[in-house]
């Protein structure tokens, strides 16, 4: 469930328990004294009610490069009426210049320490899980997944992202038998299970003090069975206990659920559509907005969404964000246009599939072909309206399928090569960091992006992003805009932090002029990347604030669409 994993770990810039890191090379290990038998009990397993006093709080501070980057708390609440043991966690990760990222969790265990149910919640997403026979079922309310869970057949632990109490529970419930314990580790944050193992590299007589090197790269210090510290050399991460911790006051509300409802004065009908495609490609779903009372075929719009995965309404996330495209498409339908809007693969009712840039171009082509054969649509008056990076897909459609696209509207579209855009975005974020950590952050960012683009040292779970980047980096927007031979509109807000309102517009404008392409440019002071009013500085956090798409922008877009789709006297082409 990659969307859930993204949401629950959103903004986490550290690697800790539950987030995989390659183990560092083992050097200078001390040899544990005493009995090295494989069945020697170095830490006795105990039941969940024997590990903590009711209400006891455990607190941990997370540091990276010697600086505090967050805290993790956990506590034992006691037994409920069903005899299940309840544990709670709170996580707070801090980032310079940004609000803290907070999450909460709850865990119910039976008397044997086996998982019963629980949840992990952040402002981005809520993931609930429960044991069902030999499986753990995860759901975010829209998607459901399950992983095998058979603790009676093989030792199995469970852990949520940055929940250090869960790590302490893991050692307390499983115990340590022999120098190399091993068990299966289930992520409660939506990640894939992993095989976990460790080596006891140091211990004192009586095993009151143990140091354990794990296969995930952590060096864990246990004192009387409790975590006293964790070190991750590869990321300069350290975790230390907080003396006399108190339970944090913050709470996390369940994230909002975004839903579209037809406007009360809607003058259009809605018809569900499937977008036909090759049998080996995922099924795609969308809907056609059909103006009521239209006399004969009407002009039509295909809306192409921007970066990231969105549903047909422009709802993205986690965290749940209303990007506002439904306001644009509703207005077009309300004013006489048939509109096709569709779910990106893996969103809404569209099936998941590999998310490469070229695959997304093909998906837009499927939508265009589907729109053209609808009986209410005039195939000679189809325009494509594309937002953000979706504009690159729109440009490719307009050049490769010139006969099918009558006009093209580019809303906040990059004009420079996308690699330049991404690196500029990263540099802007780095400049907001404290001066003492900028160079390290800049080097880490450069290495990460270089590795993704080249395919070097790319974790399996990031392979799709690497493919997408390689494909989109090959696109030259300025070259494409010069080859388009239909009317184009370029709209740009001057509060956009994703696209440079000057450099990107200039690149497209100059290329169109040099090649004789028809490009009308409209600039909108005070509007952000989503064409919503922004009184201050735009940021990802500001996208979470409920705002409407600007009325004047929508009015201009409607006027342009009417003008470029005015009926022409040329013969109508056959649908065959």
Q: In which residue ranges do the predicted regions lie?
A:
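Solvent-exposed helix/loop surface patches that form functional interfaces
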Residues: 36-42, 46, 51-57, 124-213
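Catalytic active-site module of serine/aspartate enzymes centered on a nucleophile-bearing elbow/loop
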Residues: 530, 536-575
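Accessory cap/linker subdomain of secreted extracellular hydrolases
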Residues: 401, 407-483, 498
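Short beta-strand/loop motif that positions the catalytic acidic residue
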Residues: 484, 490-492
């Amino acid at each position: 469930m990659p969307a859930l994993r993204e949401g629950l770990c959103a903004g986490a810039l550290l690697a800790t328990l539950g987030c995989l890191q390659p183990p560092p090379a083992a050097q200078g290990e001390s040899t544990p004294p005493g009995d090295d038998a494989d069945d020697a009990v170095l830490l006795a397993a105990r039941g969940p009610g024997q590990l903590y006093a009711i209400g006891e709080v455990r607190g941990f501070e997370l540091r990276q490069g010697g600086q505090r980057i967050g805290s993790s708390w956990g506590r034992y609440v006691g037994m409920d009426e069903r005899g299940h043991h309840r544990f709670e966690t709170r996580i707070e990760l801090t980032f310079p210049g940004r609000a803290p990222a907070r999450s909460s969790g709850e865990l119910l265990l039976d008397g044997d320490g086996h998982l019963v149910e629980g949840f992990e919640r952040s402002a981005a997403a809520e993931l609930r899980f429960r044991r069902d026979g030999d499986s753990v079922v995860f759901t975010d309310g829209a998607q459901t997944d399950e992983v095998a869970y058979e603790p009676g057949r093989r030792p199995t632990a469970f852990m949520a992202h940055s929940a250090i109490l869960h790590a302490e529970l893991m050692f307390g419930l499983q115990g340590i038998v022999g120098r190399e314990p091993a068990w299966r580790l289930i992520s409660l944050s939506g990640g894939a299970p992993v095989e976990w193992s460790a080596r006891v590299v140091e211990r004192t007589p009586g095993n009151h003090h143990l140091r354990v090197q794990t296969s995930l790269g952590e060096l864990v210090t246990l004192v009387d069975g409790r975590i006293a510290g964790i070190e991750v050399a590869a990321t300069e991460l350290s975790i230390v206990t907080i003396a006399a911790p108190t339970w944090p006051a913050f709470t996390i509300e369940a994230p909002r659920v975004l839903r579209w409802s037809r406007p009360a004065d809607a003058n259009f009908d809605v018809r569900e559509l499937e977008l036909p495609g090759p049998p080996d490609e995922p099924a795609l779903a969308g809907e056609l907005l059909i103006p009521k009372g239209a006399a004969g075929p009407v002009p039509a719009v295909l809306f192409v969404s921007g970066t990231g995965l969105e549903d047909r309404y422009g709802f993205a996330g986690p965290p749940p964000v209303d990007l506002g495209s439904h306001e644009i498409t509703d207005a077009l339908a309300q004013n006489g246009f048939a509109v096709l809007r569709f779910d990106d693969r893996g969103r809404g009712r569209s099936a998941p599939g590999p998310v490469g840039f070229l695959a997304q171009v093909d998906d837009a082509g499927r939508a265009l072909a589907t729109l053209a054969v609808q009986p209410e649509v005039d195939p000679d008056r189809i325009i494509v309206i594309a937002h953000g990076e979706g504009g690159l897909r729109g440009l490719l459609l307009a050049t490769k399928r010139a006969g099918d696209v009558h006009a093209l509207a580019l809303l906040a579209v990059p004009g420079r090569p996308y690699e330049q855009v991404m690196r500029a975005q990263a540099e802007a974020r780095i400049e907001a960091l404290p001066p003492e950590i900028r160079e390290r952050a800049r080097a880490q960012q450069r290495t990460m992006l270089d590795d993704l683009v080249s395919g070097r040292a790319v974790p399996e779970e990031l392979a799709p992003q690497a493919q997408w980047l390689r494909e989109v980096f090959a696109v030259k927007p300025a070259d494409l805009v010069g080859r388009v031979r239909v009317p184009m509109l370029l709209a740009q807000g001057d509060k956009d932090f994703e696209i440079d309102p000057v450099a990107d517009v200039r690149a497209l404008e100059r290329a169109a002029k040099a090649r004789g392409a028809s490009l009308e440019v409209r600039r909108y002071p005070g509007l952000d990347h989503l064409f919503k009013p922004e009184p201050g500085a735009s940021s990802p956090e500001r996208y979470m604030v409920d705002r409407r798409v600007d009325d004047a922008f929508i009015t201009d877009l409607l006027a342009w669409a009417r003008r470029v789709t005015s009926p022409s006297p040329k013969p109508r082409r056959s649908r065959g």
